[in-house]
C-alpha cells in the first residue's frame, strides 16, 4: 500500500476538474460572450499596448549594445569561445572581455553574466553574429516562443477565448514585459516556456518530468527554486522533487564542465559582490516586487536598515500564507491554480526581479481570467481581478504621458498584490467533484 504522502495517494472523493478530450478544455464551458463593441475595444487596447511596447523595443535595436542586455550573454559566449571559461565568474575577466567586444562599456558600466554557465549553450547559435543581427535573430526566436507558449496555454484559456474571441498570443504580445524581452535580448520567455511545460507535464500525471523540466529553468535559480518549493515540496510530490534534483544535477554538471572547479568558489562570490560592484543593475525601484515597492515608498522616511526588516516581514507573511494554504489544501487542487499562486508568490517575495522576469505573470493572469470567465468568482472578486489586470496591462500605455513610470516598475507590485489575493482566493476553493 502506498504511503499517505506519496504521489499516488490522492483520496478518491476529491478529483481534478473534468476535461474533455478536445484540447483539454473544461467540460462545462461558459456560454457568455462579450458584446462585439467590448471585444473590439479589448482587441484595440491590446494592439495599442503591443505597438507602444514594440516602439520601445525598436529603440534597443537601433541604439547598440549599451542599451540592451544581450551584451551580457555575448560576453559570456566570447569568454567560452576564447578559452576563458574558467574565469567566467570573475569581474575583472568579464570586464576585459566586454570592453574588448564593446569599447563603450567603461562609460555605460559593466553588465556581467551571472547565471549558471549552461545557459550560454542556448545562446550559442548567435555567438558569431554581429551584435545587431544577433539581437534581431534572438527577437525572432522569442517571437516564436511566444506563439508556442500561447498554444501550450490553450487548455487553460478555453473560457477566456470563448468570452472574448481573442487569441492567446495577442494577450501575450499585448503585455509589456513580453515585448520588452525582444528588445533586451533576454531569456525570460525561455523561463516561462519551461514553467508552462512543467505545468502541462504535471497535468498529465508526469510528475518526474514536471520536476526535471522546471530544473532546466535554474538559470534563474532563485525563481525556479521558490516555485519548486511551492508546487512540489509542499504538496509532497516526491517524484517531481526527484526530477527536479536530477535536472538540477544535470545543469550544474554542464556548468562545471564549462567553468571547472572554480564554479564552487567564484560563482557565490560574484553573487555576493555584484550589488556592490555593479549597483546600476540593482536599482530597487525598477523591480516589480515588494522589495522595489517598499524601498521606493519608504526611502524618504526611513533608512535602508529600517526598510529591510519591513520587506522581510511582509515577504514572510505573504510567503507563509501561500505555503500554509498549499499545505492545508493538499491534495485536491488542480495544477493550474497551484502554479498560479506559486508564481505570484515568487514574484512578490523575490529579492531580485527585473521587468523582463514579469513575463511569467502571464500564466496566472490568463488562468485567473479563465476561471472568472467560467463563473468561479463573485462579482467583487472579478472586479478586483480586472483592476489588477488593467493595472498590469495599462502600465506601458500610461507611461506614454507619464514617462517617469518607465523607471518606477516597482509600482507594478500593487496590481500584482491584488492578483495574488485573487489567486489565493481561487486556490482556497475546492474544485468541483465529478460524480
Locate each region found by the language model:
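Membrane-embedded alpha-helical segments of transport systems
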Residues: 219-222, 250-254, 380-383
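A general structural signal for short secondary-structure boundary/capping elements
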Residues: 217, 260-261, 275-277, 390-396
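Aromatic-enriched
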Residues: 369-435
